[in-house]
Amino acid sequence: MIIAYSLVCAATQLLWLTYAAITTETARRYGVSVGAVGWLAEIFPLLYVVLAIPAGILLDRWFRPALATGGALVALGGFVRLGGETFAWAMAGQVIVAVAQPVVLSAVSKLAGEYLPADQRATGIAVGSAGTFVGILLALVLGPTLGAHGQLERLLVVEAVLAVIPAAALVIVLRRPGHASEEHAAIEGSAARALWALPPMRTLCGLVFVGFGIFVALATWLQTLLAPAGVSETAAGGLLVGMVLAGTVACAVLPPLVARRHAERGFMRGAVLVGCFGCVALGLAPWLGVRALAIVAMGVVLLPALPIILTAAEQLAGSAAGTAGAIVWLAGNLGGLVVALLVQILVHHPLAAFLAMGAVSLLGLPLAARLTSPIGEPRGGTPAPAVVG
């Protein structure tokens, strides 16, 4: 069950970033601007922000049918992109997958709660969430290797097959009902208001807005921004692969260390500075090796920042942990949309775009300074109350 779900999560990320690693090639193929191609990826955070709350409600009321439909829509979107060699068909397929994404990604905790024993749920959630990283890596590898040099159709066929197989498996395994669970996928209104009233929660959301926003902007636009410097699609894809691989390894190592030492403030301050200097290096460095070092360093801090923030938010929220996690994801996707659109405006001025991302990163400095250790404890020493409900 969890494996099938994890692979569907991978498929959503694979289809999300299909065109991001080959933006210039896609623009030539469809006869549109690179800005238009950017919307093939940017539609995902946009629809996530719009649909996350309705998706959670659907999952709470009709969990198995909603999740099965989400998986089926992912597969359908992959095949719709094969309907014709036009931008309209590509966008239609991306919209279908983007509609399914909040349903699929919001289901992980509830799926583990209904189908796994209590002592296996944390592992199940980790396995399910790992699919997102697998999908991102696949997209960044397959795009330049299968879709470059006029072979976009071949890439779309392979990705459609990779989407339909796990979707079919998920539909089949969901025919078996799970056990009743107290896990909720929806954002609960009263809990959300209580959480948002806590300054530490707003600080965490601001940090994830900045960090996830920069990551999404880089994943969407790096190839286009580096093309004028003579960096090939394959090389740009390799840079992003290095970033995600380094970040994935760091996600397994750094969050427990940071939590054990209550070092969230120091880590976030370092992540902000590395993000800023990394963006400046990507814009100014004349050598590919320096750019590679910069983006790998960014991956090491930006990707682990998300689970660190999620853990802190859930500890702050107490029994409203599910709502806290959903709010953090909403903030991250909103940041992804806003920062990616900012870069899109500057996409024909690469240095300005990289400097703008560096400036966005610096917005996290005052936010990081507000963090206390442990999270939620005011500087006066009295812990903020966890949210109940």
Indicate where each model-derived feature is located.
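C-terminal transmembrane helical hairpin of 12-TM major facilitator-type secondary transporters
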Residues: 264-309
